[in-house]
UniProtKB/Swiss-Prot annotation:
May interact with calmodulin. Residues 30-160 bind DNA. The gene is Camta2. InterPro entries: Ankyrin_rpt-contain_sf, CG-1_dom, Ig-like_fold, Ig_E-set, IPT_dom. This is Calmodulin-binding transcription activator 2.
Amino acid sequence: MNTKDTTEVAENSHHLKIFLPKKLLECLPRCPLLPPERLRWNTNEEIASYLITFEKHDEWLSCAPKTRPQNGSIILYNRKKVKYRKDGYLWKKRKDGKTTREDHMKLKVQGMEPVSWQCLYGCYVHSSIVPTFHRRCYWLLQNPDIVLVHYLNVPALEDCGKGCSPIFCSISSDRREWLKWSREELLGQLKPMFHGIKWSCGNGAEEFSVEQLVQQILDTHPTKPAPRTHACLCSGGLGSGSLTHKCSSTKHRIISPKVEPRALALASISHSKPPEPPPLIAPLPPELPKAHTSPSSSSSSSSSSGFAEPLEIRPSPPTSRGGSSRGGTAILLLTGLEQRAGGLTPTRHLAPQAEPRPPVSLAVVVGSEPSAPPAPPSPAFDPDRFLNSPQRGQTYGGGQGVNPDFPEAEGTHTPCPALEPAAALEPQAAARGLAPQLGANGRRGNKFFIQDDDSGEELKGPGTVPPVPSSPPSSPSSPTALPPSGRATRGEALFGGSAGSSSELEPFSLSSFPDLMGELISDEAPGVPAPAPQLSPALNAITDFSPEWSYPEGGVKVLITGPWTEAAEHYSCVFDHIAVPASLVQPGVLRCYCPAHEVGLVSLQVAGREGPLSASVLFEYRARRFLSLPSTQLDWLSLDDSQFRMSILERLEQMEKRMAEIAAAGQAPGQGPEAPPIQDEGQGPGFEARVVVLVESMIPRSTWRGPERLIHGSPFRGMSLLHLAAAQGYARLIETLSQWRSVETGSLDLEQEVDPLNVDHFSCTPLMWACALGHLEAAVLLFCWNRQALSIPDSLGRLPLSVAHSRGHVRLARCLEELQRQELSVEHPLALSPPSSSPDTGLSSASSPSELSDGTFSVTSAYSSAPDGSPPPAPPLASDISMEMIPGQLSCGAPETPLLLMDYEATNSKEPAPSPCGPPLAQDNGAAPEDADSPPAVDVIPVDMISLAKQIIDATPERIKREDFSEFPDAGASPREHTGTVGLSETMSWLASYLENVDHFPSSAPPSELPFERGRLAIPPAPSWAEFLSASTSGKMESDFALLTLSDHEQRELYEAARVIQTAFRKYKGRRLKEQQEVAAAVIQRCYRKYKQLTWIALKFALYKKMTQAAILIQSKFRSYYEQKRFQQSRRAAVLIQQHYRSYRRRPGPPHRPSGPLPARNKGTFLTKKQDQAARKIMRFLRRCRHRMRELKQNQELEGLPQPGLAT
């Protein structure tokens, strides 16, 4: 600055002194006028000239910010007085989505470096909708308050003739904001941006209008991704539903039988020539040619923008009879999810019809299969048939096809073969399909019916759509129902026809149906009527809502803004036809909590007492982002609907393959009776009903006699089939599985999948899942099945009831607690039954009619479900019930357990399996029904085998112990002994192997005692056993116990069994002792390490303490030493001074003091500075003393003089 000539300029308004280069002021003239608009960017010189014309700034300044200035506007602001950045436009933001993205630059003027004088600065921002629209702000760094703002669409003049439309932001982080706007808001944004711009295709066609540009934005930028009702498992992850994914997997389609709507396209045929393509062409997928569509309204575009892909419909060529065209055909396609292999889908070219029909009609294609009777059921499980051929109990899946009946006078209906392979729609979505019918030449309108395969239930009116009013000249004709012969109708005419001479089809618009999008993507439960779409445009719009998504568990607080002001109104929010209460937090803001729902997009709407109050918006349910396992235990008990459904089907397929392998090996499954048909009323969701039907069809065909186990690979999260059913809340499936388990009691494969005490990777039982997710009916069924699951904690130590309380399922927890109290109140211990009168055995025991494997521990469960079958509440039993009645009285499908392990022989007669628990608990009162036909329960009293074996060994006679057990019994032995000897060695080896491995089975109780909570059987003393065993030889009590005595061989067998048990227990005890020693050694080693660490810490602490004490002592001693040293120095100085003073006093007169300096030797007396000071003090004291002595002498002399006046 000091090396160049500068000019001082003072601004009039702020009196600021701005120093600018003299060369700059000479080359830039002052501007007399600021142009309000300029359709090009200003040069740097022009910008600088505007900013340095200070005398005109007061005249040019704008006092208020302008809202959405037009293209080319130039405005001057004072940033201290006007917030010019709030101009109404939406500018690009940074990646964080909060701050605007700005580009800053220093500008050169006349080639002068800005660093040399630091005067001109610029800031640029770009539009988020049209990236070529900029706002540039300029100011002087020495005068930053005055800002020159210029709005301009950059390629306005250069690129107008090159393309057919401007460039829009296709991928932007801000799209979520501006794509929520309505058509009017987008028009308000774009009109000022394209002010003064003329767009054309350069081929003589008419210019584009801003309305067409807005329509193009709405067509090419969908507001939301295509609705996905579940996360696809075929892709890389579970996904959040943000990408459109097509999958033809069978399980994929079974899990989500919803309609994935695609775009609706209409092609109308005029009288004379095909329609010309409009200037705006809606985009289609790259593999399909673009269909000619007319631009529809804004609501139509916004409503259909979430569809996956548009359809392509090729219009039929016009034909004429007698030189004039009489009509045409328009087809509205509403396709389903997928296509069959080899079929021609509606997304491909539609072949023109062979014979065009004269009247103009509009057919709704909603079916996928031709009307044909279903094939007979095959014995093997076919997933494709499971999807496409609904059987009894199906509540979704749609009809077999469409059978439109055209009651026309001339011509017969020839269905288009290309329309048949489309996928089927569910009845609810099909009933809401759109079928406008237009008549011609005074003919009556046609009626279209959507028919199911074998259901004669008529769909009522609430699910239909009211008629759309036709054009003013046409009068609606009264529709007449024409049901096909032999079948009941499943729908009504959705639109009435219009009689008139016009054959042109009106363009189809979704503006009258704000809820169509939400209805198409919803999966409504049967029996719940859908709310009728509102035709009136008086519905308010939801301005904003947050958050926009939730996990499938729901419970997230959602705030919704809009024109809600009535405090007395009873507001509710409808999530996919699930209404939840809403409260008015403040005027314009509603608060609600979203319900649980499966993954996908759902419609959200605000409703009042009299009906809907707002239009629908899209709310998203996202899947949790984990592939197989949650990251922590806290995220474990969460519903992953699609994965659970997939896993259920995988388990059923594996079981079906297992059955097929058994059948192929020669063990043909027994042909049992067919399962009874399931009623349609109250059967729950469709997926559960169809799985129940599949399981019921597998029950009579199943045979599980092989000892092999199913190889499942890696099960989903360690969850069994019963886990998955409980997590989904499928009570009917749980009941069916319990019936299957009761029928097949000896199946280890079935025990792996259907065990109420089985646990997953985090030790959660099926009852834990049902309690955590609030499925009351399923939880009660599982509790009735085996109440022991209520006391099994997960890996965090939480019990099912505590999890239910913590998650807000209070009603479920109270119901289970009440059932538990009822069972505990009716329990009574059973007395011992009288001894059995069987001549073959001398032990009173209960023979189990089931296989031996029922009494063993479950190898897939940490807790065995076999020993303790938890029965439902039953009246108390008499105390004299015999123990033989136990097998017939075990309830709830729990397998019976032999009282003793040595009672290994099963009876040949199989008793019928007991029925499982009563019907599911009623949802209204939570109490079990009175007529539950469950048999009464009897407690199974356990026996301590170790103590019993010891008593048996002590009581066995010595001669029995000394006998060689391996010898063959003598000829006089009973036939029972002969037959028993053959399998005795096998029995003993089996018993020994069992007892060797019994501790390896996972069990919560110690091996010495079974996991029971009831009283134990009293062990008889040794004398009683001796008396009992010696009764066969002594002859005592033969009259009373002749039938209860044991033979020598039986006694020897009993003795060997007791020895095996005792030996196994000793081995187990030694092994346990060794394990305890190892654990103790590890504990001692760990404690010793800790002790050494603590000892070293204590030693360091003691050392530190001693060092501290020593430092304190040293410091105190040093202080005292220093004080003593100072005292001694001062004392020596005082003595020296005193000596000098005494010598001075002894002198007769004042010493003659030479005028010169003191000799050098005298200086040596004052060694230190303090001594010098002390000497000076002493000298001052001596001078005062000398002066006082003089005064005293003078006073004495004055007193000695005679006083005047006294002489006489």
